[in-house]
UniProtKB/Swiss-Prot annotation:
Cellular component aspect of the GO annotation: cytoplasm
Keywords: ATP-binding, Chaperone, Cytoplasm, Nucleotide-binding, Stress response
Annotated region (A), positions in chain: 1-345
Family annotation (Pfam families): HATPase_c_3, HSP90
Major subcellular location class: cytoplasm
Function comment: Molecular chaperone. Has ATPase activity.
Protein name, as recorded: Chaperone protein HtpG
Amino acid sequence: MSQQETHGFQTEVKQLLHLMIHSLYSNKEIFLRELVSNAADAADKLRYLALTNDALYEGDGELRVRISADKDKGTVTIEDNGVGMTRDGVIEHLGTIAKSGTAEFFKNLSGEASKDSQLIGQFGVGFYSAFIVAKKVTVRTRAAGHKADEAVLWESEGEGSFTVETITKASRGTEITLHLRDEEKEFADDWRLRSIITKYSDHISVPVEMWQEGTPERDGPDGEKIPATEGYWKVMNKATALWMRNKSEISDEEYQEFYKHISHDYTDALLWSHNRVEGKQEYTNLLYIPSKAPWDLWNRDRKHGLKLFVQRVFIMDDAEQFMPSYLRFVQGLIDSNDLPLNVSREILQDNHITKAMRTGITKRVLGMLEKLAKDDAEKYQQFWAEFGQVLKEGPAEDFANRERIAGLLRFASTHTGSAAPTVSLDDYISRMKEGQTKIYYIVADSYDAAANSPHLELLRKKGIEVLLMSERIDEWLINHLTEYKEKQLHSVTRGELELGELEDAAEKEAQEKLAEESAPLIERIKAALGTKVADVKVTSRLTDTPACVVTGEGEMSTQMIKLMQAAGQPVPEVKPTFEVNPAHPLVSRLNDLQDETAFADWSNLLLQQAQLSEKGSLADPSAFIKLMNQMLLANMK
């Protein structure tokens, strides 16, 4: 036996242990679900490794998990004969959290137990859940294929450190013993443990066993002798792959527990789909839409994808090749009959079978969401609030399904008068005015900025609905979604307003007349502003505001410029088109000014006001304030 070594826990582990004990106390029994789930994973991993090295079974290929309790000692032991761990593996897996984005996770914690317990659940506590009920945890483990004297003993009281030493262990696998706190001794009871296993672990494909005591010989009711029975390890769960069972035999509770097993989520899934596909490719998929977004959904390093099985043998986690990135929130598994057992991520990458399965699974998920949107709008809004921004990546990523994805998108709109994104493109089309051929939208920094934009004035007056977009991804989305059901999406802040048949002949004639009469004013403003603008025009979109700026048809929008600047990208200089409203009193007064210096100052002030309204900021706010103060002083004399 080697000398004992003491190691300090990683800082994040200390924080997690403290939080778990204080935040997960209301659902203590989940410790058993987590530890049994880990044990089943260890069995799956050994089964996979043994495909290429049968010697790892060491003559014992019957994989299982065994649970036992000792009331007198106040202990619970979970033992598996799976893959086991080496000394380095123990230090790595039981002393650190090897996850990207860990620091970000701890920033998200609020100190409110109910919210934090949900976050911790999403993070996946796994092994550390043992400390919810245990004052001390002892782990004895030996990696498959290693010598008996290369086993490891790990021990900790869940405070600041743990000890590790080399021991001898005849059998491979891992044995975890929980020394229960005095107030948690209820878990050292066979019946209590059986009820938890039935509740949480029925779906696990590895047998979960508990010791069934034998009975002595006894007399029957008619005096006959009933022979003694020997004690044995009794299987407590169904121990068959849930996804291979008939759908009609699986309860909603079983589906939900299986979801929690594969996702390590503590909340129920929003919906799921269980299907067997036959034909050119044969595979089974079980797909879940979570009810809550994971805390690290936007972390670029976050692993995502489905669990991959081949002929019921677990192959890998996070097989992202079967799911496009914009559906990365989907959890579940795929079990293929066509892929080879020695399949690797590299083989999956350019495999025609993989591509066909990916196409089928993508359509399946989109179908699930379409059905949800149609059958339960309220539940769909719940989905949208969690994952809508990710789904908006779809039109850029998946050209083949662009129209279907577009039908699932939701936006705020001038029709509802609410910031809630509840309007679909189909809703919009159903309310289009007679003669309307375009879907009008605006992208701004916030809902209020979009809803109150002067660019909407004429459209509001005519009762034409405008979609209000204010998420960072909206500008990216709209660059890849230019039409829907043969209706062009048209920005109200870019180029001409293009009302087409919505503008009658009299209005058009009046607009042309106004432009003609205002031509001298427009030329004066152009001269005053010089190179600050690309052009100056009489507006066709304003009714109550003196002026606005618009982007040219082929130029980069204000929102796209902001996105690129935020990402540190070089941005080309874009000069706006300045539109003025000659019917507004300010512009009318401007036309009467004879002093060209004063005229230039007022023209600049109107331009900067319009830019402030459009961008929310100015390149040189000090110059704007100085000019405004100067104008105020001049008019107070």
